[in-house]
Amino acid sequence: MEHEVVSALAAFTQRYVDCWQQEKGHLPASEALYGIPSPCIVENHEDTVYWSPQPFAPAAALDGVERALEISLHPDVHAFYTAQYAGDMAAQFDSLSCQLLQVWSEDDFTRMQENLIGHLLTQKRLKLTPTLFLATTDSEMTMVSLCNISGEIILEEFGTKKRQILAPTLAAFLFGLNPLAV
């Protein structure tokens, strides 16, 4: 049976691609990802890469993060980061604009794990409960994260205990996202 997060992420990604097709007349495009190898690349044109999501292969999990910190990660975060390769996706959740973080390639998956380890080490040092980032916001100090203990999706201020619950689960958060073609 497919994990609920995988289904919710696939549904959001399809809404995102459809939004780009309807508003821009082409696949999602990025200048920031131009020149970076990925199985997602459909076409490079001038300084822009046009991409389409691809299945994550070979099968993987965030085992490196778990081993490095001797911690068990919430199953939702494994599903989220290993379901597909894609570019980051702009979205809105209620009035919150965010960039849903995605894995672009196998190399990017390694980098993402290193960043998650750094994030969790900082939280441990500050004696904060563990969270795993999922999206960036317009502010460099706030991010959308998954609480590793409850599975809730929260808006957190980096390095502080300041947290606001956005959704009870990652699947609920993904189903509540509206794509933005920017």
Swiss-Prot record:
Keywords in alphabetical order: Cell inner membrane, Cell membrane, Membrane
- Highest taxon of source: Bacteria
Give the main location.
membrane
Q: Where does this one sit in the cell?
A: Cell inner membrane
Residue ranges that the Swiss-Prot or TrEMBL entry lists as coiled coil? none
Function noted in UniProt: Interacts with the SecY protein in vivo. May bind preferentially to an uncomplexed state of SecY, thus functioning either as a chelating agent for excess SecY in the cell or as a regulatory factor that negatively controls the translocase function.
Q: What is this protein called?
A: Protein Syd
The organism is: Pectobacterium carotovorum subsp. carotovorum (strain PC1)
